């Protein structure tokens, strides 16, 4: 797939380590791309689960994917403030079908008051054993949790105060 440009719509697919499709987001609008990252927005986006259940995202969310970091970041924009959901996941790849990554179960939730919570540790451990995650991936993921927490604590990148405002405003300009 050629690198999508600003205003294009793409599909996002998350997989599990065993290669099974986990979840699909249809029609994510691309806000910015470069050789290493993609910033997009989901706003009332159709999501299809692996068991074919479907739902639509409730609020706008700015999404951030990187080719070098083992996480992606979703900034959920709500009336009461911005909260974040961060997936520990492989760096993304693009092909003719979609932006794709492997979801490794561990998640970090950042509440609007700044509180952080590591989620799904038991699910990660269960899948690590069941799907035989290599020790190298286990190590990489744990190191990337540290990098992610550092970004959160230092308001780096998607966690900066200006980031969500800048990209949400850009979304409104593009959708006109």
Swiss-Prot record:
Keywords: Hydrolase, Magnesium, Metal-binding. Mg(2+) 1 binds at residues 87, 103, 107. Belongs to the Ntdp family. PANTHER family: PTHR39159, UPF0374 PROTEIN YGAC. Mg(2+) 2 binds at residues 105, 107, 120, 123. The lineage of its organism: Bacteria, Bacillati, Bacillota, Bacilli, Lactobacillales. The active site is at residue 23. InterPro entries: DUF402, FomD-like_sf, Ntdp-like, SA1684. This is Nucleoside triphosphate/diphosphate phosphatase. GO terms for molecular function: magnesium ion binding; nucleoside diphosphate phosphatase activity; ribonucleoside triphosphate phosphatase activity. HAMAP family: Ntdp (MF_01568). Its EC number is 3.6.1.15, 3.6.1.6. Gene3D superfamilies: FomD-like. It catalyses: a ribonucleoside 5'-triphosphate + H2O = a ribonucleoside 5'-diphosphate + phosphate + H(+); a ribonucleoside 5'-diphosphate + H2O = a ribonucleoside 5'-phosphate + phosphate + H(+). Pfam families: DUF402 (PF04167). Its cofactor is Mg(2+). Has nucleoside phosphatase activity towards nucleoside triphosphates and nucleoside diphosphates.
